[in-house]
């Protein structure tokens, strides 16, 4: 029997002899009530136990948006247009907004990768940078002795917005 499996951004074709195949487990298809864009807008209009972002931020504040790097499937490029609109409604200016890709111990992105992650509009309007372990501000030490060092663009922001997704991770 021939099968196609998603692998990276492509497809891996494999053949398994019928005698070696016990069965195939497939996920059930779940119908979405809203499109991705509609869901992002709903989340911004109906925040859980919070004011709307436009009601929290103030004109002139520096805003850091922290998001995942290329190793995670967070659809940052799909979220950013609505998020930027929300921030602008609250009085934020593009020159005061920085999108920070939290790379942790991973390699830095290329400009092309950062642009793809941010999306064309965000890339054109705001500053998009990788976190930098060599440019951190030391905020202190935990009770367990662990140093707390935060990348400068995030530490110096007046407001920090963290984007992320929930996924199985091992």
List each language-model region with its residue ranges.
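Short alpha-helical segments and helix-capping/turn motifs at coil-helix boundaries
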Residues: 48-51, 82-86, 143-153
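N-terminal amphipathic/basic leader segments beginning at the initiator methionine
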Residues: 1-43
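Glycine-rich phosphate/diphosphate-binding loops that line cofactor/substrate pockets in enzymes
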Residues: 48-64, 89-94
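Short glycine-rich or small-residue beta-strand-to-loop segments that form or flank ligand, phosphate
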Residues: 62-73, 98-104, 162
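An acidic, phosphate/nucleotide-engaging active-site surface
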Residues: 109-170
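Histidine-anchored nucleotide/phosphate-binding helix
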Residues: 73-92
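Hydrophobic or amphipathic alpha-helical targeting/insertion segments
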Residues: 86, 90-100, 105
